[in-house]
Amino acid sequence: MRIAQITDTHMRARGELWKGRVDPAATLARLVAALNRIGPDLVVHTGDVADSADREDGAPQYAVAADILSGLKAPLRLLPGNHDTRAGLGAAFGRPGDGFLGFSEEARGLRLVGLDTLEPGRTGGRLCADRLKLLEAVPRGGPVLIFMHHPPCPMGLPFMDGFPFEGGAALARAIAGREVLRIACGHVHADVERHWAGTLVSAAPAASAQLPVDLPAFAESPRGLPAGFTVEPLRIRLHDWDGATLTVKTVMVEAVEGPYPFPP
């Protein structure tokens, strides 16, 4: 069972650049082509599908994202990020309603749980008692892989850690005594991991751009903005489950040299 994770596509209207540099539609199209070459059994998008649905009409952004993602050969699961809206995401991807957009399903003995951490008006995420019911309903005793947009703890990134997560202690209690193999996140625009609450919290690299890991804290940044971002070759996080062990790989899917043969 191979589960591919993508995150933070920050879709704009077709032809519109993100931060004047990145074409999200073209980037997502390349990402879909790469995913179809890899052939995962499932794709999970861990949020910020749109770039500014939280501040303006996100329908054009979601329409572009839905059109491109419809080209995926594998089934798709989506979670909202802080730049998304539940209504917009649900309408574009066939999940109408005002409820939380989580999921819980079994795949070859591995329980996959997607938690909705969106809290409108907040950059940081939140898990409330209602959202945690999805996880608490999972029978104990089997392995669990959790997906969510926001990491539930500081990740050692001064800028992004300045937007705190609400509900981390409750999540830690909910996973206590469970075999939670990993909490797979996005949000921070960096490839970074941290041991927390007896498991590993892992943020995947963004599909749009990366933030330097040593950016100063929000309060110390001019105008409250990071000094800059980098546009890097696309990477995809792969979670491979063989029925007993989870192996996680980050693969670069474009602009690499080689492979070169080893000299004799």
Q: What are these model-derived regions, one by one?
A:
Residues 59-136, 170-180, 194-197, 209, ...:
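Extended active-site neighborhood of metal-dependent phosphoesterases/phosphodiesterases
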Residues 5, 45, 78-80, 146, ...:
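Structural beta-sheet core signal
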Residues 14-18, 50-53, 117-127, 153-162:
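Surface-exposed cleft-lining segments at the edges of enzyme active sites
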Residues 1-60:
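N-terminal active-site segment of His-dependent metallophosphoesterases
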Residues 31-42, 124-202, 235-238, 242, ...:
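His/acidic metal-ligating clusters that form di-metal
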Residues 1-13, 109-119, 145-148, 199-205, ...:
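Active-site-proximal beta-strand elements of phosphoester/diester hydrolases
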Residues 8, 47-48, 81, 149, ...:
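Active-site glycine-centered loops adjacent to acidic/histidine catalytic or metal-binding residues
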Residues 203-264:
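Acidic, His/Gly-rich catalytic cores of divalent-metal-dependent hydrolytic chemistry
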